[in-house]
Amino acid sequence: DALRRFHEMPMPTHWAPEGINDLDFDKIRYYLAHGTAPYKSWEDVPDDVKRTFERLGVPEQERAFLAGVDAQYDSETAYNNMREELSKQGVIFVNSTEGLREYEHIFRPWFGKVIPVNDNKFSALNHAAFSGGSFIYVPKGVKLSQPLQAYFRINSESMGQFERTLIIADEGAELMYMEGCTAPKYDSATLHSGVVELVALKGAKIQYVTVQNWATNVYNLVIQRGLAMEDAEIRWIDCNIGSGLTMKYPAVVLQGRRARGEVISISLAHSGQLQDTGARMIHAAPETTSNIVAKSISIGEGRASYRGEVNVLKGMKGCKNNTECDALLINATSRTDTYPAISVNGNASAVQHEASVSQVDEEMLFYMQQRGLTRAQAMSLAVNGFINDLVKEFPMEYSVELRRLIDLEMEDSIG
């Protein structure tokens, strides 16, 4: 049924970037396993897979500051482990396939409820082809002091990765989940089309952090949506640096009174890249609050677009939204676009949207170069200053990595 829906539903060409039409679904491999199993011990992971994740620093980070790790290699989870004390508290952290099989009574009621199969063409594709991803359940009142983390690696040519992540925070529970995404570059197109569903029950808090650094041959077409019940909070902290085309709009449906939603977004588009990112906030209950802060950087002929939706449903009162959208153009050929959609159908609500576009000041760069910095160093300093207030929202380990990646992009752009 899901595959039939995928074939019947049209591509979102009425608003999506033109580059999406170049994707040939017939040339994508929809499942590729390497004989791996979700090992619980790092020593048991096959050597070739282990070497890949060791270069990414997975075992060191797990020992240093993580409560649990899930590492996916192409279509399947290669490694999954969680600290023993969390298991004793009833926390579940497994791959989604195992979650469906072993914890069906928790998994099944919410699977596909936040993002149904008929939501759009790519949700149907994910329903038909999904494998891997994370399933997390945090019991009532349990608050995790350390983050859980997942790594997604596409290591093969012409691959399609269709992980499915479902995170449920029971009443009063709190957690942070972080994911990193990487892939080597190939000449042929690769597709990443994951689905993420978050459920924050009464008074729960979920923070979902992403640093995406796919290779530029990757189409990054993902759907991420959270459901926040009464007094719950969902925060998406999102950074997109890689992929040739990204379409990504984290959303929060504010379903319960006094629910809160936030999206913090950083996008960087180099020549040959289009970062079409943004956020959606649906105020479906009174006295709900949302905040969107998005910053984009366009380098060379890179293009970054902000696409956002804020919708206060009919009859909702006392809702508040703040949206800030800032773009920085590095070169005269760089491009940015903003497509806000705001709909307020209730009374006594406040919605505000601010947007700005600026260019790097040549006089400022000249001044810094006179103080001994190279042009690349001066440019990195200017860019890091532009996004500094958002980078501070990322966990320490990710913020350091993020600054390093941006420095590398600046060096490559100047040569």
Predicted regions and their residues:
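N-terminal amphipathic, basic helical "cap/leader" segment at the start of enzyme domains
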Residues: 1-119, 123-124, 293-296
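Conserved beta-strand/loop scaffold segments within soluble protein domains that form the structured core
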Residues: 79-373, 387-415
